[in-house]
């Protein structure tokens, strides 16, 4: 088995999908989890205005709507959380995503004050954060807020990780990568677009250039620039297609060096890191 085949298998990726079937699969997955653990009353998700959180948010609200109708349990809710750092440049996209999702509840937590306070505390301890590490601080502050909300609403935190993100480890460890349940896991980027199109999402929310937008020195830096490969390259790789050797090597190098991000903390029983 080639490394490409191993990666495809590990991430559960498929070369082709039926959008309606995958929508149903994710919604049923969320519903089943909530029914298995009836003490869970809420799904909590940060909404950025990008493709992934828009899709995950819509699926969460669909699952909650169906469960309430089927069980009569009105205590169930989906909580969409806006987590800007100061003023977000694409705030209108966030509002458009909220309008599309129609969440039960919307909370806004501006993380800038908390991030600056943390940065100052570290500075006083003799640690000056680089712009890149400050970006990770933002991602972790966002996740901290979501877990606080989940803790106070008997909830779980929903993630947006999918195959095209997992393969490169393009997430912050214990930031946006630290979640309870990931309904998009298995899909590549273009497949996520297919689901949103089938759901009637406004096109500009999934046709915009994806960006983590964590760095102050490089605001709205496109993911594809940071990664050195395009999402079309990554999707083609996950669909088992042949790519130029250098492109495939770049993707595989990302996968291998970020393996620790896709695993629990390393113990004496692990040996994957010895490769």
UniProtKB/Swiss-Prot annotation:
Deamido-NAD(+) binds at residues 140, 173, 180, 260-261. ATP binds at residues 46-53, 160, 189, 211. It catalyses: deamido-NAD(+) + NH4(+) + ATP = AMP + diphosphate + NAD(+) + H(+). It comes from the Bacteria. Mg(2+) binds at residues 52, 165. Pathway: Cofactor biosynthesis; NAD(+) biosynthesis; NAD(+) from deamido-NAD(+) (ammonia route): step 1/1. Keywords: ATP-binding, Ligase, Magnesium, Metal-binding, NAD, Nucleotide-binding. Gene3D superfamilies: HUPs. GO terms for molecular function: ATP binding; glutaminase activity; metal ion binding; NAD+ synthase (glutamine-hydrolyzing) activity; NAD+ synthase activity. Its EC number is 6.3.1.5. Pfam families: NAD_synthase (PF02540). GO terms for biological process: NAD biosynthetic process. SUPFAM superfamilies: Adenine nucleotide alpha hydrolases-like. GO terms for cellular component: cytoplasm. Catalyzes the ATP-dependent amidation of deamido-NAD to form NAD. Uses ammonia as a nitrogen source. Belongs to the NAD synthetase family. Homodimer. This is NH(3)-dependent NAD(+) synthetase. The lineage of its organism: Bacteria, Pseudomonadati, Pseudomonadota, Gammaproteobacteria, Enterobacterales.
């Amino acid at each position: 088995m080639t490394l490409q085949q191993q990666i495809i298998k590990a991430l559960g990726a498929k070369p082709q999908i039926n959008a309606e079937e995958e929508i149903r699969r994710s919604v049923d997955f969320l519903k089943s989890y909530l029914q298995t653990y009836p003490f869970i009353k809420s799904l909590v998700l940060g909404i950025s205005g990008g493709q992934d959180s828009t899709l995950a948010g819509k699926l969460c609200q669909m699952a909650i709507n169906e469960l309430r109708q089927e069980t009569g349990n009105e205590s169930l809710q989906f909580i969409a959380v806006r987590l800007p750092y100061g003023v977000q440049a694409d705030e209108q996209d966030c509002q458009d995503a909220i309008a599309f999702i129609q969440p039960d509840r919307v909370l806004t937590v501006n993380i800038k004050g908390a991030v600056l306070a943390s940065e100052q505390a570290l500075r006083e301890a003799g640690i000056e954060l680089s712009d890149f590490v400050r970006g990770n601080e933002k991602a972790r502050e966002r996740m901290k807020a979501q877990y606080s909300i989940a803790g106070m609403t008997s909830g779980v935190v929903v993630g947006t990780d999918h195959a095209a993100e997992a393969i490169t480890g393009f997430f912050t460890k214990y930031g946006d990568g630290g979640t309870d349940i990931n309904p998009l896991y298995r899909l590549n980027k273009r497949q996520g677009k297919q689901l949103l199109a089938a759901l009637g999402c406004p096109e500009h929310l999934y046709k915009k250039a994806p960006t983590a937008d964590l760095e102050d020195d490089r605001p709205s830096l496109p993911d594809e620039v940071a990664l050195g490969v395009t999402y079309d390259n990554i999707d083609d790789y996950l669909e088992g297609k042949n790519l130029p050797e250098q492109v495939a090597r770049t993707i595989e190098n990302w996968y291998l060096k970020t393996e620790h991000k896709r695993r629990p903390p390393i113990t004496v029983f692990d040996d994957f890191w010895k490769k």
